[in-house]
């Protein structure tokens, strides 16, 4: 039997949801939780009949009164009616819009400005301020009023205001839980994750299924980031997630297991079970996800299918033909052998699982991948797990939010809507979300912003912990001294998948002496905000395939924050490991401290060549490095052997003064030569 939501029925009857809920409980003994609850059509029709009867009798009475009054003064009433009709039209428009908002407005904090509540009530600022004055409150447009006052004000305009509590904002699952009854559910496509050890042929297998060459475009044949693809098979769609197979990306693979219905575990027939294969099996068991084993590379000379099945039994996976319940399909991504059998098993398994979703509800799902695109801004790949997502919808994703400006399918085509089990790429988010974040569709962007801001504030509070400054070069000493108990890291990368991979690998480096903690991970260039966070939390910033901007460089030098950038993920891991063991060698750079022009040359037999020079810039210091430059070309590089001011030895001579000097192991100084003095200074390594 069909159902209708309370707010929809209230809109049809032109009454508030609160009034309708009261009516349902008192007149019909129907208990409803809130305006999003659904009631039977039969009850809805009875309510319509009841209220339409009342309205009809009231309307008849009003019309009789109106006829009587009009007869008394027809000309005056005619003019009044014209004005009244205009007002009624205007009010009707407002009421219609209010009905769409279900007669309920919400506050996300303890206070609200007069401007905000005016917009929510769809009343002019003057009307609202006037009502406040009548209530004894003098307030300007930008002044805030508390919840109690806002509640009274809303009642004046026949509206009700609700304050969203923390639980409701944080647990959107409860808000979006309606209409999960069997009658609303429809069959959906299975979501398949392909897992396995590196080089066992995961992407090649997907390539064989999709009949498109993806492997050749990926560096070293390794999938760098999670991709989501939809393929058609016998009129049915199957969505594939491809997770990277390397051990460093365990976090990404685990995230894939949480959104998938069936896992295809790819095992090479000539290699057997490997470390990443074991991890994949663990993730599947932990997530209670069905598993199909694809024994790949059966065309290889050393292929041994029975050996693979034997190894699988050690992990509790017994093949069907060995009396177990694990589906094992021998395949060859190269020759396409067994591909059809594998696809048939996927469809068979999905039928047994009876996968269903409700496409007519608000959308929710998971962020598969996210990145910052130079031309398009924050871009996120979403996997819709329930409901239908449309262009123009407002969503909240972790601590970010947005209104969908554009949506693309896995083939890059622009689409207007997408249903359950569909991967889409969206534009319009305020920031780059975290991979693995849940997304929820909400009524309006303002609601999404309120929820996101609250979450962001909570995260920010967790970050701000102030301790001693740390750098990789002196990390070991600080650990030995006991001043460092926790190494905080801020990780920035070009894509979210890399952030998670680094985070997972770095946190494994924790020891008894020091705990490694990634306090923040994000996508995009290293900015001043990251440096501020590192300053407050005594952290080190690690960049992977990204660079710090100018403001970040200035701020890091000012605050003494260590920034390291890398292009290879394992170099970052090795540097942290070496620093913790006290083996990281510091990096040095040359700093020119001054230049001098040779104006006169003296040759002394017992000493050598002495140059009389004038300091042009900076200063010259004894025992500093020195190079002789003639006509822009470096002639010789050594050290200052001596430095004198008149007849006295000098430690240094400043700009604007003359001095006598000699160069270690060099006597061919000529007038007009430039002596460049420099020192080697230890620096924080900025790049490899």
Curated annotation (Swiss-Prot):
Its main location: cytoplasm. GO terms for molecular function: GTP binding; GTPase activity; translation initiation factor activity. GTP binds at residues 196-203, 242-246, 296-299. It comes from the Bacteria. Residues 332-334 are annotated as: G5. Residues 187-354 form the tr-type G domain. Residues 53-100 are annotated as: Disordered. Residues 196-203 are annotated as: G1. Residues 242-245 are annotated as: G3. GO terms for cellular component: cytoplasm. Residues 296-299 are annotated as: G4. GO terms for biological process: tRNA methylation; tRNA wobble uridine modification. Keywords: Cytoplasm, GTP-binding, Initiation factor, Nucleotide-binding, Protein biosynthesis. It holds the Pfam family IF-2. One of the essential components for the initiation of protein synthesis. Protects formylmethionyl-tRNA from spontaneous hydrolysis and promotes its binding to the 30S ribosomal subunits. Also involved in the hydrolysis of GTP during the formation of the 70S ribosomal complex. Belongs to the TRAFAC class translation factor GTPase superfamily. Classic translation factor GTPase family. IF-2 subfamily. This is Translation initiation factor IF-2. It comes from Clostridium botulinum (strain Hall / ATCC 3502 / NCTC 13319 / Type A). The gene is infB.
């Amino acid at each position: 039997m069909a159902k209708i939501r309370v707010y929809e029925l209230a809109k049809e009857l032109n009454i508030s949801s609160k009034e309708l809920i009261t009516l349902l409980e008192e007149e019909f003994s129907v208990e409803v939780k809130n305006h999003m609850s659904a009631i039977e059509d039969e009850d809805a029709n009875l309510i319509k009949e009841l209220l339409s009867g009342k309205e009809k009798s009231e309307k008849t009475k009003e019309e009789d009164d109106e006829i009587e009054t009009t007869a008394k003064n027809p000309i005056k009433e005619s003019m009044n009616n014209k004005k009244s009709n205009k007002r009624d039209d205007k009010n009707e428009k407002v009421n219609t819009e209010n009905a769409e908002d279900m007669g309920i407005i919400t506050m996300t904090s303890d206070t609200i400005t007069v401007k905000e509540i005016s917009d929510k009530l769809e009343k002019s600022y003057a009307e609202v301020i006037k009502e406040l004055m009548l209530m004894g409150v003098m307030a300007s447009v930008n002044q805030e009023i508390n919840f109690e006052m806002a509640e009274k004000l809303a009642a004046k305009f026949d509206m009700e205001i609700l304050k969203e509590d923390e639980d409701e904002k944080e647990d959107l699952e409860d808000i979006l839980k309606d209409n999960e009854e069997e009658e609303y559910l429809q069959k959906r496509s299975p979501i398949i994750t392909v897992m396995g050890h590196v080089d066992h042929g995961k992407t090649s297998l997907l390539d064989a299924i999709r009949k498109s060459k993806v492997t050749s475009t990926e560096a070293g044949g390794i999938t760098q980031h999670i991709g989501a693809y939809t393929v058609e098979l016998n009129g049915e769609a199957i969505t594939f997630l491809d997770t990277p197979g390397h051990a460093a990306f365990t976090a990404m693979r685990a995230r894939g297991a949480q959104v998938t219905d069936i896992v295809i575990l790819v095992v090479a027939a000539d290699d057997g079970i490997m470390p990443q294969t074991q991890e994949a099996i663990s993730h599947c068991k932990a997530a209670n996800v069905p598993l199909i084993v694809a024994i790949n590379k059966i065309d290889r000379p050393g292929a041994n299918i029975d050996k693979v099945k034997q190894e699988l039994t050690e992990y509790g996976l017994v093949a069907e033909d060995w009396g177990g319940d694990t589906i094992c399909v021998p395949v060859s991504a190269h020759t396409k052998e067994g591909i059809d059998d594998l696809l048939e098993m996927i469809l068979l398994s999905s039928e047994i699982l009876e996968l269903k979703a409700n496409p007519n509800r608000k959308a929710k799902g998971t962020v598969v991948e996210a990145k910052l695109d130079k031309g398009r801004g924050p871009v996120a790949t979403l996997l819709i797990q329930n409901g239908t997502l449309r262009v123009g919808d407002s969503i909240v994703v972790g601590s970010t939010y947005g209104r969908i400006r554009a949506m693309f399918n896995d083939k890059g085509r622009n689409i207007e809507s997408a249903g359950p089990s569909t991967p889409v790429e969206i534009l319009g988010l305020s920031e780059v979300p975290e991979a693995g974040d849940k997304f929820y569709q909400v009524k309006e962007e303002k609601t999404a912003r309120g929820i996101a801001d609250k979450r962001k504030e909570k995260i920010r509070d967790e970050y701000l912990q102030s301790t001693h400054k740390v750098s990789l070069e002196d990390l070991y000493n600080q650990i030995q001294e006991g001043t460092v108990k926790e190494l905080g890291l801020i990780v920035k990368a070009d894509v979210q998948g890399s952030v998670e991979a680094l985070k997972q690998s770095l946190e494994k480096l924790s020891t008894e002496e020091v705990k490694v903690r990634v306090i923040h991970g994000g996508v995009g260039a290293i900015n001043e905000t990251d440096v501020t966070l590192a300053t407050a939390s005594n952290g080190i910033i690690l960049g992977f395939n990204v660079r710090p901007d100018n403001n970040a460089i200035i701020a890091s030098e000012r605050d003494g924050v260590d920034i390291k950038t890398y292009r290879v993920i394992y170099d970052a891991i090795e540097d942290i490991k070496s620093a913790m063991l006290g083996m990281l060698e510091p990096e040095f750079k040359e700093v020119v401290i001054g230049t001098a022009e040779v104006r006169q040359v003296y040759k002394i037999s017992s000493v050598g060549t002495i140059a009389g020079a004038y300091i042009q810039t900076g200063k010259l210091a004894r025992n500093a490095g020195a190079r002789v430059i003639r006509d822009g070309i470096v002639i010789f590089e050594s050290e200052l052997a001596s430095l004198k001011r008149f007849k006295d030895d000098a430690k240094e001579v400043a700009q604007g003064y003359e001095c006598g000097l000699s160069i270690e192991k060099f006597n061919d100084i000529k007038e007009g030569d430039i002596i460049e003095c420099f020192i080697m200074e230890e620096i924080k390594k900025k790049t490899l």
